[in-house]
Amino acid sequence: MSIKLTEQEQIRLSKLDTYKKLNINPFEKIEKNLNYVYSKDLKEKYSSYSKEELESMDLYFDLYGRITSQRGPFIVIKDYFDKIQLYFNKKEHLDLAELVSNLDLGDIIHAHGKLSKTNTGELVVKIKTLKLLTKVLKPLPDKFHGLSDIEEIYRHRYLDLISNEHSMEVFKKRSKIISLIRKYFDSNMYLEVETPFLSNYISGAAAKPFKTFHNALSQEFTLRIATEIPLKKLLIGGIDRVYEMGRIFRNEGIDTTHNPEFTTIEFYEAYSNLEKMMQRTEELFKLIAKELNLKTLQNKGEEINLEEPFKRVDMIDEVSKATGVDFRNVTLEKALELAKEHGVKLKKYYTVGHIANELFEKLIEKTLVQPTFVMGHPIEISPLTYEASDPRYVERAELFINGKEYANMYTELSSPIEQLKRFEDQLNEKAQGNDESSDIDWDFIEALKYGMPPAGGCGIGIDRLVMLFTEKESIRDVLFFPTLKNKKSQG
């Protein structure tokens, strides 16, 4: 099947014949590694000099970049950091005239020339030699508007990055945030580790897994839904402070805060507890804000203050206030009645604890604008967590900001006997239709029998964290390549 080319594509393709006649390779390789410079370095170092001073200094530089505009003898190229103007004097370099006349927006070039300034005081490199490195055969998106179709932005992120400087800045900030997170944990004597993506057991979170099959072993595996269990095994092994940052996979819905594969950090610290995990989490968020020079954030018209101490509330107290019913003493019958009143979809295995959590998600989550730790979760929804003084609840907290959950932390359950009982309770829920319940992880139970020190642990969603600090509303805006439905299968 022949591909229909646009007029622009036909023109660009025809130029390949011209390059052949000129003995120019339109898809060149780098023969010699040069000490090239970035435009921002030139601007930082030489912007304060006058044109006359620069001319007398006789400075020559090599630059690489993509052509973003071409006007008369001036060519503007963009590198990773910034743009700079090149000047081509046709009279002095007739040998380059045909090459320059056949350049197009988007072409990637190598220029060598003398640094100077224009009459308006802008830095410019006067071209001495010029080389085409990569010919662009398709026209780039309009430089002023970029890609307008949001689906096309996600499907062709490379074009978005070329044409939209703001998108590029978002992903640079993402990289900086990840570096800051590593710096924080490394400086606090945590050891970064890597654990398997393929798992024998579904455990560590309430989520549906992706399944795969290993041919050589004739065995079914799941892609990990959390890193909690292997990291706790490393606590047992004697690594007192451990963290992992990596991809997690959950076979669930896609929306503005969920993507089937996403990045988290989980960290565990021996001889600590929930209080320490809340302290570490608050420190981390405030460190990132400080390093990014952010005191407040704007989100949907709300100003979020990251400098004040994070609030703390109790889940059951908040549900009791919202419903007008004391949920510490409510009967299951009354809880079911309230759930129906508030449009909660009931499931067979639901207890008062499950219903309290559902009502919290429905009535209260969206109201938590300022950073807030929600504590005191029901034991039914926290199978890996140490119980509180009231055994119906556990030592757990979730951090909410602007109505979204950003972190989940708790004092870790260390008893193999109690952990087995919790896993068995999860199996009972699974039998009643809870397809997000954990299996019994016998290997983990065996590991716990060798003794896990008292510990605190926490998981933070990196993508949501980046959304927060870049003030983005959709997780797709902070993922280079979000999961999308195949075009061919779209109806």
Swiss-Prot record:
Single GO MF annotation: magnesium ion binding
Quaternary assembly: Homodimer.
Record GO biological process: lysyl-tRNA aminoacylation
Listed GO CC annotations: cytosol
Binding site for Mg(2+) 2: 405
Biological source species: Mycoplasmopsis synoviae (strain 53) (Mycoplasma synoviae)
Swiss-Prot/TrEMBL catalytic activity: tRNA(Lys) + L-lysine + ATP = L-lysyl-tRNA(Lys) + AMP + diphosphate
Cofactor: Mg(2+)
EC code: 6.1.1.6
Name the UniProt record assigns to this protein: Lysine--tRNA ligase
Keywords of the record: Aminoacyl-tRNA synthetase, ATP-binding, Cytoplasm, Ligase, Magnesium, Metal-binding, Nucleotide-binding, Protein biosynthesis
Pfam families: tRNA-synt_2, tRNA_anti-codon
Stored SUPFAM superfamilies: Class II aaRS and biotin synthetases, Nucleic acid-binding proteins
Cofactor: record remark: Binds 3 Mg(2+) ions per subunit.
Subcellular location(s) of the protein: Cytoplasm
Residues annotated to bind Mg(2+) 1: 398, 405
Residues spanning the membrane: none
PANTHER family: LYSINE--TRNA LIGASE, CHLOROPLASTIC_MITOCHONDRIAL (PTHR42918:SF15), LYSYL-TRNA SYNTHETASE (PTHR42918)
Similarity comment text for this entry: Belongs to the class-II aminoacyl-tRNA synthetase family.
Gene: lysS
Record InterPro entries: Aa-tRNA-synt_II (IPR004364), aa-tRNA-synth_II (IPR006195), aa-tRNA-synth_II/BPL/LPL (IPR045864), Lys-tRNA-ligase_II (IPR002313), Lys-tRNA-ligase_II_N (IPR044136), Lys-tRNA-synth_II_C (IPR018149), NA-bd_OB-fold (IPR012340), NA-bd_OB_tRNA (IPR004365)
